[in-house]
């Protein structure tokens, strides 16, 4: 059962799309206060677990830490980070009873989940203007499905988006991209997408293409399609301030950029230099910005990724002036300005919360200060594209995913989990984020495989790819200046061909399970706790996940390991895709097992009485041969497979 409670005058985020009547008073769970902002406090029993929060740090069970919903462009994802790129304010308290809460609040929201006091959870925010939805049910999964039912259907990607993609910040020219595709095809490593980071643009201007680097962009797009490759250009949130740039001039003329309190347009620096931010909370501006995607769609592009949309700010005029003044005092020998203060001021320039208080959105004629609705920017930037695609391409799906998000954006696109690093711990973080994201409606998700920042290693990349085989978004992405990490940069490319090839062998199953989850408000990834709630060991296992109703995955995520321990909550069939293209199968009883997994192998476990469809190796999604599909698993088991053309809107 879902109950809605109204506090103050909430901002309409449109995260919830189902009409729910308001209930009087407070939820009959914990204590609520509006005396000093808003707070909700409840005691946690020793065996209570807290699930949710979507894209957040640490484990699947969120107990024992402080999480802050405050979309932040901070690539240093160490354990102490309290905020990442997204704000997903849905939690479930799971113990002897099950209860879920969605706090529909677009500003900064704090979740102290046993951090200050181990047996107490407090959710708080500065302003007591929000909707609180309380959901009760028979199980954690029941609560998730009820929640998903009120926030609307998850985004459905085109089928080609379930192939493998190669990306790197640093591909600049048409020749760079052609070389990547050529090397993949020559080495027979599967590939469906190549991503275009900011260097394809003219001076980092949205909806432009550098004509020197791409003299015939439309022809290039068509050439790639002949190779069965979809190009995926990036779009950033900031619009360059430049006379003669049509997007800038139109936005100024129509009043579609965010303004300061005095009515002037707010300026901040991002990649293009000084920029304005489109006022995507203004419905007219949102439509205007979304329609600009047609500039590239009309040239044959059918996939995009939105970035820098927290929105990221390098510095503002005020921030720069403050830094210069501090540096000047230090140079002049001011004893009140030690050297470290200059460094702190420099670091504080980027994404400074004071800057988010300096600009406003025009929402139905009312000026709303950005920091009050900060977490909605990435959501509404992607919404602008999603709504535009329905007009531009009414019959055909377009791939879209974003870095920043709020619940509600899940209807318009997926997300990737941002600028991770080439750390073994980030493989595990990737794994643990997946079910939490699914709880909040984000199904088309994945991480930068191999790690975005720092230098990867061959073994780390192979192990991460073996997890990426199962994530809907499977993309290798790396930062400028890091070690090149395309598979052909390493010895024994046949190992990469095999691991990535397993993805294509499993597409008939993975795509089917994704579509079932999207169409039925279900989870593609589930924690073991949701499937085996009465099994104490399963409830506390966080490095294994269930996919659909048929399989469990348990990737290897430690360096130099030749395998790992796995807990089976029931009898299962251990299936290992071997480096030579064959499969190893063994039925294992319930219990703890050590399974060996070589670097060029991909393991999975099929539940008792189940089977899954597996195809032959293919180099692109369109090349997967329907007649090659056979069932793998328990003899006599059946599987209901979802199929469609992978293109038409549903």
Which residues are covered by each model-predicted region?
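Glycine-rich, histidine-containing beta strand-loop boundary motifs that form or position
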Residues: 42-44, 55, 94, 102-105, ...
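Catalytic core of carbohydrate-active enzymes
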Residues: 63, 78, 376-377, 382-398, ...
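A residue-level signal for conserved active-site and pocket-lining positions in enzyme catalytic cores
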Residues: 90, 147, 184, 224, ...
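Aromatic- and carboxylate-enriched substrate-binding clefts and catalytic-loop regions
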Residues: 190-496, 531-532
């Amino acid at each position: 059962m879902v109950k809605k409670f109204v506090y103050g005058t909430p901002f309409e985020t449109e995260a919830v799309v189902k009409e729910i009547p308001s209930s009087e008073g407070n939820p009959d769970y914990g204590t609520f206060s509006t005396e000093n902002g808003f707070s909700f406090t409840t005691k946690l029993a020793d065996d209570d677990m807290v699930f949710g929060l979507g894209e957040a740090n640490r484990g699947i069970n969120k107990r024992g830490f402080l999480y802050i919903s405050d979309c932040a462009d901070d690539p240093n994802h160490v354990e102490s980070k309290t905020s990442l790129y997204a704000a997903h304010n849905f939690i479930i308290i799971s113990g002897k009873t099950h209860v879920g809460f969605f706090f529909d609040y677009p500003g900064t929201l704090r979740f102290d989940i046993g951090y200050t006091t181990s047996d107490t959870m407090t959710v708080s925010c500065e302003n007591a203007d929000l909707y609180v939805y309380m959901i009760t049910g028979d199980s954690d999964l029941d609560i998730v499905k009820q929640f998903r039912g009120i926030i609307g259907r998850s985004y459905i990607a085109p089928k080609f988006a379930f192939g493998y993609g190669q990306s790197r910040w640093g591909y600049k020219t048409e020749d760079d991209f052609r070389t990547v595709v050529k090397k993949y095809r020559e080495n027979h490593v599967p590939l469906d997408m190549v991503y275009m980071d900011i260097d394809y643009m003219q001076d980092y201007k949205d909806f432009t293409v550098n004509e020197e680097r791409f003299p015939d962009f439309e022809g290039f797009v068509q050439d790639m399609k002949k190779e069965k490759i979809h190009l995926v250009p990036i779009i950033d949130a900031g619009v360059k301030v430049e006379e003669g740039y049509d997007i800038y001039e139109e936005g100024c003329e129509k009043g579609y950029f965010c303004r300061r309190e005095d009515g002037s347009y707010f300026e901040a620096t991002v990649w293009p230099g000084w920029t304005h931010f489109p006022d995507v909370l203004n419905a007219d501006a949102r439509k205007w910005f979304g329609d600009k995607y047609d500039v590239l769609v009309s040239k044959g592009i059918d996939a995009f990724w939105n970035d820098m949309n927290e929105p990221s700010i390098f510095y503002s005029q005020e921030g720069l002036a403050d830094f210069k003044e501090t540096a000047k005092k230090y140079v002049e020998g001011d004893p009140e300005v030690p050297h470290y203060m200059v460094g702190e001021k420099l670091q504080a320039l980027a994404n400074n919360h004071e800057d988010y208080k300096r600009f406003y959105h025009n929402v139905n004629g009312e000026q709303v200060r950005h920091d009050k609705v900060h977490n909605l920017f990435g959501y509404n930037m992607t919404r602008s594209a999603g709504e535009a695609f329905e007009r531009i391409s009414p019959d055909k799906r377009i791939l879209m995913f974003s870095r920043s998000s709020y619940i509600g954006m899940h209807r318009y696109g997926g997300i990737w989990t941002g600028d991770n690093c080439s750390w073994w711990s980030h493989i595990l973080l990737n794994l643990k984020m997946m079910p939490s994201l699914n709880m909040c409606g984000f199904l088309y998700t994945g991480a930068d495989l191999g790690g975005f920042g720092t230098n990867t290693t061959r073994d780390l990349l192979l192990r991460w790819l073996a997890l990426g085989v199962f994530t809907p978004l499977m993309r290798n992405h790396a930062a400028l200046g890091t070690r090149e990490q395309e598979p052909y940069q390493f010895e024994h490319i046949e190992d990469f061909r095999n691991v990535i090839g397993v993805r294509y062998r499993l597409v008939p199953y993975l795509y089917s399970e994704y579509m079932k989850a999207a169409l039925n408000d279900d989870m593609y990834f589930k924690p073991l706790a949701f499937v085996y709630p009465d099994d104490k060991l399963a409830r506390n296992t966080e490095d294994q996940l269930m996919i659909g109703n048929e399989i469990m995955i348990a990737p290897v995520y430690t360096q130099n390991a030749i395998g790992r321990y796995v807990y089976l909550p029931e009898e299962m069939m251990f299936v290992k895709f071997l480096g030579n293209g064959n499969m190893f199968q063994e039925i294992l009883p319930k219990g703890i097992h050590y399974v060996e997994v070589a670097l060029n192998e991909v393991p999975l476990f099929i539940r008792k009485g189940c089977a899954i469809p597996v195809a032959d190796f293919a180099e692109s999604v369109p090349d997967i041969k329907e007649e090659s599909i056979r069932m793998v698993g328990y003899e006599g088991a059946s599987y209901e497979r979802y199929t469609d053309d992978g293109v038409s809107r549903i």
